[in-house]
Amino acid sequence: MRAFNRNQKIFCLILAVLFCACARPSRLLADDKDSTAPPAKPASAKPNSPAPLSERERWMLDRMEQLEKRVAELESRSNAPAAPATVAAAAQPVSATAGEPVSAASAITAAAPSATVIPAQPAVATAAVQEKAAAAAAPVKAEPFAFADFTWLNGNARTKELAFDTKFFTPEIRADVDYVYDFRHPKDDTISGSSEIFRSSEVQVTQLGVGGDFHYDNVRARLMTQFGMYSQTTPRNDASPARGQWNLADAYRYVSEAYGGYHFNALHGINVDAGIFMSYVGLFSYYQFDNWAYQPSYVSSNTPWFFNGVRVQIFPTEHLKIEPWFVNGWQSYGRFNNRPGFGAQILWRPNGWLSVLGNQYALGEDTLNTPGRVRYHTDDSIQIKYYDNPEKFMDKAAFSLTGDMGCEHGGGVSCAGGSAKGPKQSFLGYMFYNRLWFDNDRYGLTIGGGQINNPGRYLVLLPPINGATAITGTPYFTENPGDPYKAWDVSGTFDWMPSQYITFRWEYNHRAANVPYFTGPGGVTPPGGNNGAPGSFVCLTGISICNGSPTNTWLPDLRKSENRATFAILVKF
């Protein structure tokens, strides 16, 4: 409106000037000519007819008409409702050279917005833009467990920065190389009773993993290889390939993780994956780089490292994960009998210093060729970071506590024991670890250990006597209903971590059992190497029939305890 009032005043001023010009046309004409030009002659006209318009007058009338149109246009704009139209950039301001007058019309043109206007978008397009704006303004749901730094957890990788990442692929490389010194000096360099350590007085590649995570358009997949000792030792602990054909142990021998799935943008995320994935029953990771110790206690070492099946990871909040499983069996590539296994994990992290984990397993028939024997197991852990002061030399401290209970019933055994169904077949154990970090996490010290009681030995790792596996069994260490087994261990671990991608680890372990179980100086390999069927006695030289008697049978050297030292280099990118 102010622009309109200003234009109205200018318009009145021009009218006054025009009136004066009409009253004295000769003066106006003289002003338009050069001062040296001769005076113009007046034109003849009828006495009552109007005088003819000069060129200057016609120009001024044209300018007045343009001004009237501009004023009308301004009035229509000021009275029209606001529309979501985009106005083109205003004309550049009129610049005048010093001493050169600026006409009123030019001033009005410069002051008014440009007449070039982009038409308003259709209502549908406007609505779409508004919807996109609303979606952009909507709060983004927090990523699960991203609210704090959980690299301190036992079983979690401590790397905080990815070495390399793309929109489609996040690579991962792991190397685990160790040297173990067994104080009993077994002559065949074989170590029994562990799912992490296998040879003595030798440098061995426990695992070389190459792979990573694929992720694009909500589709996900993961691959991790297991070259090295794991490719032999992990499959030999699974008896399910003995049922049926196609050599499942060989088919999966060189992969530790292999699955594909889809991510749903619901709640705080839902992942559906199928294939081989880590179980984390027993808290410790399958990969030693992620753990506080190299040799975990029995509660971890004797429980599943992987499952083959389908999992659904549901994140209702950024603090909670609920993960049901449908799997072939208890750390198995296939089924042992006619029934698969079912389980679930619940993980709750309310803040940055507390993690509560529960793994439950049920209904699987996991004893080979024994249908009707059903397994149940619960594995529950709590981890607390009770000290955190980065400015001190000892900058962090935390502990983990894990408790496990389980049993089997049916097929000649019972959970309680002392019944007509059979002897007690159960598992009870715990482990506790305390870790300290020093010098901004460059050094770590862990003390821990645990204890188990497993009558029936259904979760005891079978010693590799004469090449025995979970499929063959061995008469030298039976796993029959009612067979007793109690064990305990303690360890001390020192880590030097000059980079977040490497750990130099020194560890001492003492392990013991109530029955001869660990490899002694005589080893667990017959003279000259494995001899005959692994599930049978090995006869002494020159004897064709043997029954386990020392007079006719070769006997492995098994002891009730072991002491060993381990040095390992662990790498993860």
Predicted region positions:
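Outer-membrane beta-barrel pore domains
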Residues: 234, 243-248, 354-364, 370-573
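Outer membrane beta-barrel
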Residues: 121, 131, 142, 157-329, ...
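Bacterial N-terminal signal peptides that target proteins for export
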Residues: 2-13
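Bacterial N-terminal signal peptides
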Residues: 12-22
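N-terminal periplasmic/intermembrane-space "pro-region" immediately following the signal or transit peptide
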Residues: 28-188, 550, 573
